[in-house]
């Protein structure tokens, strides 16, 4: 004990604090959110096609449809990029999935992606099919090809309900 003070007061004295006042905690610096940007595409899509067709057994026509609609491509790191667009067709979300079939699998949503605009396809009928991952969506279409272009699909790219609510908001006639 220092200066015949109780233990707690002695510690406060050694720490340079008076009357038991503590220092205010520093406030964390707020980082400005980064603007959304799609990953840089690679020149060809051979690895993406090979992975989706050979490893995941997705039909070539289904892949080609989403590539043609600019909703699917291969990035410079040879990942599959699943693009989500808003009502005007502008890219607002991107989900990346590695084409690595051995070892660690890499999946992530691009920073600053708008979760309500995940990978989706709008149809003309009242059916909405909901999936956790984009590859699940493509697999379902491959396994159930009859009339698939008439249905609406959404992949939540995780467990958020926001993409489903946005599809229902955009098209109230969906079941």
Feature-to-residue mapping (PLM):
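Internal active-site segments that recognize and position negatively charged phosphoryl groups
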Residues: 54, 58, 80-82
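Helix N-cap/coil-helix junction residues
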Residues: 5, 57-58, 128
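Phosphate-handling DNA/RNA-contact segment within nucleic-acid enzymes
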Residues: 75-170
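Non-catalytic accessory segments of DNA primases and related replication-initiation nucleases
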Residues: 1-53
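Short, basic/aromatic recognition patches
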Residues: 58-75
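Modules that initiate DNA replication and primer synthesis
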Residues: 1-8, 163-175
């Amino acid at each position: 004990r220092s200066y015949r003070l109780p233990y707690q007061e002695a510690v406060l004295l050694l720490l340079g604090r008076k009357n038991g006042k503590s220092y205010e905690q520093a406030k964390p610096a707020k980082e400005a959110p980064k603007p959304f940007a799609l990953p840089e595409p690679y020149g060809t899509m051979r690895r993406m096609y090979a992975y989706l067709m050979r490893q995941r057994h997705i039909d070539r026509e289904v892949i080609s449809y989403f590539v043609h609609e600019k909703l699917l491509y291969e990035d410079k790191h040879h990942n599959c990029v699943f693009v989500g667009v808003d009502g005007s067709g502008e890219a607002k979300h991107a989900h990346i999935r590695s084409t690595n079939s051995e070892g660690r699998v890499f999946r992530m949503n691009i920073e600053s992606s708008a979760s309500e605009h995940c990978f989706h396809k709008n149809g003309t009928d009242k059916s909405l099919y909901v999936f956790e991952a984009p590859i699940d969506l493509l697999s379902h279409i491959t396994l159930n090809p009859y009339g698939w272009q008439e249905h609406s699909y959404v992949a939540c790219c995780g467990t958020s309900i926001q993409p489903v609510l946005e599809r229902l908001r955009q098209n109230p006639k969906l079941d």
